[in-house]
Amino acid sequence: MCPGIREWPEDERPREKMLRKGAASLSDAELLALIIRTGDTATGKSAIDLGRELISLFGSSLRELGSADMAEITAIKGMGMAKAAGVKAAFTLASRFQGRRLENLDRFTSPRQVFDYFHYELRDCRREYFLVLLLDGKNRIIRRVQVSEGSLNQSIVHPREVFCQAVKESAAAVILVHNHPTGDPTPSQEDIAITRRLKEAGEIMGIRVLDHIIIGDGEYLSFVERGVL
């Protein structure tokens, strides 16, 4: 029989802990346990065990867990379709909230503001993600676009992919954002070359590249602040 969380000391149970101390006091695995709700009798895993396995499978990256499909989630023994559907629903709701949050921001005024917006989303990712913020003539947010996923190079991050949506949305400027899975935001020579290439392409198209911000683990690097752009 699956060892139930109900049998645990009350101060260790996720639900009781949240009610007493607030949701922020829970670990990622404990929060997932509340979404998963029950353990699995066949495997003897508790809901927290399943939550921990999910986090481990995706390298502690909530972004990559959130983008996983049902087949990837149910690959874990004990994670049936109902549990996987609950996890997908929670991440989809969080993604929609994140989008609303972006819409509610009047404008980006500093590199720090960009970092504050993106670092929780990107800091634990095992892969590099390259995103573009589209801005109007008053630096107000139009939307965000993901350009690539995986190792950055000039063949993947092509001006065509970066500026295609900018042209469609009549954007006046863009801010480039990507993460370094190592946690060190120091730009590589490839990063610098890509940025210069995109800036030159933007100048030809009349779309300004305002900054390129690299997200690290608790820190960031702004090409403008560093004097690279």
From Swiss-Prot:
InterPro entries named among the record's database cross-references: MPN (IPR037518), RadC_JAB (IPR025657), UPF0758 (IPR001405), UPF0758_N (IPR046778)
Residue ranges of the motif JAMM motif: 178-191
Gene3D superfamilies associated with the record: Cytidine Deaminase, domain 2 (3.40.140.10)
Residues the entry annotates as binding Zn(2+): 178, 180, 191
Gene Ontology MF terms in the entry: metal ion binding; metallopeptidase activity
Keyword Protease tagged: yes
Top-level taxon in the UniProt lineage: Bacteria
Keyword annotations: Hydrolase, Metal-binding, Metalloprotease, Protease, Zinc
Biased amino acid composition, Basic and acidic residues: 7-19
Keyword Hydrolase applies: yes
All copies of domain MPN, residue ranges: 107-229
NCBIfam families: PRK00024.1, radc
Descriptive protein name: UPF0758 protein Ppro_3582
